[in-house]
């Protein structure tokens, strides 16, 4: 079949007893043992379901940890995302690649075709785990990584979930790697960015946050319209070298004109200034606001254009289409899949116009 060798094949083998255990409680994070074969290489792994609301979907997403050998291609674990609610299957990868081009740290995302016990499971997006191996691959300084796990990761002293003052400044975060001292640095950063008076904010924030990287991340959210991106769907990395925090995007399927349910989303849904306490305070400083505006203007003329994005979208679409036809959960929806490149391009056109029309308010 044409393009047959164009996606890597991941064959998963799970003992029926373990598969039954896995399916018994989809909310259980405990993994079961399994085997993964890639290019004749046999890997002993632990496998579990991943995600929150996505666990309810027919096509499951998986978290895979390598057991024997302990690492594979320089990683200790990977995520296999079903991208079930995205009719294009491409939005997450498009977004993460876009962030990377904007100059933001971003996980690598590559398509693979997955089989389980000989049965086609379909097209998946393999997502690199953001951990110490991620840092090592990029020759980045050792440091702490915190995952933003819910809406309390809002850079505020107030809880989004409880609508009252947070009982702990670490609420909303889960430490992936780092020390107890790093917990203090996270709390210190959140406390300072919320309590420092305006007159001292500019000099104080630059002691805690890489503002240039933060503005690039903010621009990435605003271009892709990830409504959830301001308060979760990210990881924080504190460089042991600079002592500064930067933000790494995560889970960007609800973007490029569709929401988390896969429904069409208006191009003006996410405002140009973004959201969250830190964003508001940073953009309140004229120097930072001007930098952000210049970044948007430059990107609107380069990366975020139909001329630049359409060839990428079409190459991705053509690469995975033969495999979508073999995906048991997606093959009957192929007509919708075929319309998606146009939907994404229409979003770029409309979003670009919205942003150009609103640059003047920055």
From Swiss-Prot:
Induction: Expression is negatively regulated by the transcriptional regulator GerE. Pfam families: CotH. One of its GO terms (biological process) is sporulation resulting in formation of a cellular spore. The keyword Nucleus does not apply. It comes from the Bacteria. InterPro entries: Spore_coat_CotH_CotH2/3/7. Keywords: Sporulation. The keyword Calcium does not apply. It is found in: Spore coat. Belongs to the CotH family. Involved in the assembly of several proteins in the inner and outer layer of the spore coat. Stabilizes CotC and CotU in the mother cell compartment of sporulating cells and promotes the assembly of both early and late forms of CotC-related polypeptides on the spore surface. Assembly of CotH requires CotE and GerE. This is Inner spore coat protein H.
């Amino acid at each position: 079949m044409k393009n047959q060798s164009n996606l890597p094949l991941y064959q998963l083998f799970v003992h029926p007893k373990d598969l039954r255990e896995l399916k018994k409680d989809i909310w259980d994070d405990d993994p079961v043992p399994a085997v993964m074969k890639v290019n004749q290489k046999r890997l002993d792994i632990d496998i579990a379901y991943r995600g929150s609301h996505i666990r309810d979907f027919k096509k499951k997403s998986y978290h895979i940890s390598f057991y024997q050998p302990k690492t594979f291609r320089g990683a200790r674990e990977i995520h296999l995302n079903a991208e079930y609610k995205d009719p294009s299957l491409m939005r997450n990868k498009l977004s993460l690649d876009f962030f990377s081009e904007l100059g933001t740290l971003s996980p690598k995302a590559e398509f693979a075709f997955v089989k389980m016990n000989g049965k086609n499971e379909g097209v998946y997006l393999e997502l690199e785990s953001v951990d110490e191996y991620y840092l090592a691959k990029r020759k980045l300084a050792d440091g702490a990584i915190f995952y933003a796990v819910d809406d309390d990761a809002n850079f505020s002293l107030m809880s989004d979930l409880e609508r009252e003052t947070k009982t702990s400044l670490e609420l909303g975060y889960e430490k992936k790697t780092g020390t107890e001292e790093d917990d203090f640095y996270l709390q210190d950063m959140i406390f300072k960015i919320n309590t420092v008076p305006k007159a001292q904010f500019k000099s104080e924030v630059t002691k805690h946050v890489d503002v240039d990287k933060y503005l690039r991340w903010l621009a990435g959210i605003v271009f892709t319209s990830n409504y959830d991106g301001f308060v979760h769907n990210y990881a924080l990395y504190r460089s042991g070298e600079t002592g500064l925090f930067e933000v790494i995007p995560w889970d960007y399927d609800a973007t490029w004109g569709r929401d988390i349910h896969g429904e069409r989303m208006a191009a003006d849904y996410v405002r140009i200034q973004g959201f969250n306490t830190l964003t508001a305070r940073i953009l309140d400083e004229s120097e930072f606001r001007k930098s952000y505006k210049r970044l948007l203007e430059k990107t609107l003329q380069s990366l975020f254009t139909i001329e630049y994005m359409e060839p990428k979208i079409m190459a991705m679409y053509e690469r995975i289409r033969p495999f979508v036809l073999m995906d048991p959960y997606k093959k009957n929806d192929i007509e919708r899949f075929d319309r998606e490149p146009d939907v994404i391009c229409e979003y770029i056109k409309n979003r670009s116009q919205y942003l150009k029309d609103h640059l003047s308010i920055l």
